Amino acid sequence: MCQVFGVSRSGYYNWVQHEPSDRKQSDERLKLEIKVAHIRTRETYGTRRLQTELAENGIIVGRDRLARLRKELRLRCKQKRKFRATTNSNHNLPVAPNLLNQTFAPTAPNQVWVADLTYVATQEGWLYLAGIKDVYTCEIVRYAMGERMTKELTGKALFMALRSQRPPAGLIHHSDRGSQYCAYDYRVIQEQSGLKTSMSRKGNCYDNAPMESFWGTLKNESLSHYRFNNRDEAISVIREYIEIFYNRQRRHSRLGNISPAAFREKYHQMAA
């Protein structure tokens, strides 16, 4: 064989016994760590956030090298999809002015909340989800789920948020013009709690961008990868995603690549 390929016998055996370079071995070890981190973060992190995730677990790697190894491993984030609007603003109920005008710039928790409804398909029928998000911390303050898209569902989410946070008077509560948010009972809760009511312009999803962004994240990173047999299955997955992953683990670039819960804790430590 050596004669056929025109190489010496000693050269051939040196090639057979040659060990991978230190760099190659280091890359292989890093690939294992990257794969583990990719799975741990539910296949949702790009290079920047994955680099932070690795660093906090004692793995230091440059961004270019990480990008190269991710490409070699063919790791990709879960794909984004578009979703339809949920609430119906065709009603004769009173509508509040838009106090935010797409200026989402609070300087502390419990200054601006955004609220919205979405739905999840199951074999048993639709599951509706009402959520409230703190714009400053990106945290889902509270949420409620049910079989019907009613004012009672949105009211339950708001009541739980108020009970858990006890925000100061003057907090801006922003939503779309859906009848569930314009309902008399819902507005009474807001007024009695000292909240300022703000509503999006008709048909303008960008006026409630922070909440729309969360729905997209929830569906892209979690719900679109399931086929639920019933509502209980969907409820379990949603609860786990929000309470375990999104609020406590998922890194947000806007928050300095830390989780909403960590950002809130950091704020209170600095304010103390």
Curated annotation (Swiss-Prot):
GO biological process, alphabetically ordered: DNA integration
Span of domain Integrase catalytic: 105-268
GO molecular function terms listed in the Swiss-Prot or TrEMBL record: nucleic acid binding
A Pfam family reported for this protein in Swiss-Prot or TrEMBL: rve_2
Ranges in coiled-coil conformation: none
Keywords: Transposable element
Superkingdom: Bacteria
NCBIfam families: transpos_IS3
Protein name, entry field: Insertion element IS600 uncharacterized 31 kDa protein
Organism: Shigella sonnei
